[in-house]
């Protein structure tokens, strides 16, 4: 996500949206008298042409891997081969590419913006960050190319009370983030394997099923932190010291 300079990025996004332009303009009209939320809407809409996701029957089937593991008791690698044998290897040509600018509805975006602002405004560290930091590291409705869905509320239901209690002990954002990470490690309910990392999973699925490699774990953590109003993003270590590959890491 990059900072949006009106009119260039916003105007381009509205033109690019095609028939969906009316939905995006509804959002802008809705916030016409709220300067901060209007700027947030401009930021999100201006970035939409550069974000997309895929849909398709094969993709939905391939996302069943963890459920197959639970049902059959097979390893992640065995389930991967079974999925590919049943539904075919992942093939983007069988999926439909959908751009955010042409897919996001006014109801979705308004609900998202209102919810994120509601969480952010009650966090004691909100005043320490610029509005630009908020837009970049808390506001986005997606992380990568996962399904388009409203996920924040489910994360807050699961972890919001814990976050509030930690804020009451120490309102420092680093303390709260570290304590949340300690709690997640203590839960010990993440099935660590990259064998099922051949498609992208939504934040709601990762909240319920807790599986995957570095990409999925980073996505889950960023979704959780942002849902709780903790600024967070993903960077990439170019060279993993333990193997010949790069890996994503969360940054606070």
Walk through the language-model features, giving the residues of each.
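Hydrophobic/aromatic-rich core segments of domains that either
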Residues: 11-14, 30, 167-178, 182-183, ...
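N-terminal Sec signal peptide cleavage junction
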Residues: 3-4
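Secondary-structure boundary elements
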Residues: 15, 23-26, 34-209
